[in-house]
Amino acid sequence: MDSKIIVALDYETEAEALSLVDQIDPSLCRLKVGKEMFTTLGTNFVKQLQERKFDVFLDLKFHDIPNTVARAVRSAADLGVWMVDLHASGGLRMMEEAKNILEPYGKDAPILIGVTVLTSMEDLDLLQIGINASPMEQVIRLAHLTQRAGLDGVVCSPQEVEILRKNLGSDFKLVTPGIRPVGSEFGDQRRVMTPSAAVRSGADYLVIGRPITQAENPAEVLRSINASLANI
């Protein structure tokens, strides 16, 4: 099955992460490796996940001068990851160079997505960095810029999914963190939604961490979430 679930691996050690990974089925999810784990464990950890047949979303949110970001994206492609992201606030030229460097990879290129507004940020957070707009307004602005640059989609909170789907079309990928199954705590995510509600709104992929990784039976939780999405 082509699962919509991306499990966020937020662990302090390789042993903890692989203990979880070895309990779940690669046909039921993809895996997200972020800054903490990648900085600690490097490319070898990604390769171990790939050897277990998991698609990997390399969530490093590149944001630098265009040439540097493009080369980093190329390195991610050489690593064979399924998806990689960058900050849309890095600008049009940065995103275009990142997209262009993937042309030689053809169908083997990773999905390239832009990060709009982090789901932990609220109006005051944006104002404090000089952005006089609501999170929704800034997300829409950056999502349009991302599409103009030719990227495959964006990361956005569940509340922005519906309006982005209407504005950006059916082929533009929407990757949604801030997903909490019914009964889960919100944690540090401020704009959240259940898996089924997010998919109904138009999300393509759902990033879920602690509700799965900290569950007593992660495999069962994963199966349950997939089942809840089966008929949507």
Curated annotation (Swiss-Prot):
Keywords: Decarboxylase, Lyase, Pyrimidine biosynthesis. It comes from the Bacteria. Pfam families: OMPdecase. PROSITE patterns: OMPDECASE (PS00156). It is an enzyme of class 4 (lyase). The active site is at K61. It catalyses: orotidine 5'-phosphate + H(+) = UMP + CO2. GO terms for molecular function: orotidine-5'-phosphate decarboxylase activity. Pathway: Pyrimidine metabolism; UMP biosynthesis via de novo pathway; UMP from orotate: step 2/2. Homodimer. Belongs to the OMP decarboxylase family. Type 1 subfamily. Catalyzes the decarboxylation of orotidine 5'-monophosphate (OMP) to uridine 5'-monophosphate (UMP). This is Orotidine 5'-phosphate decarboxylase. The lineage of its organism: Bacteria, Pseudomonadati, Pseudomonadota, Gammaproteobacteria, Pasteurellales. The gene is pyrF.
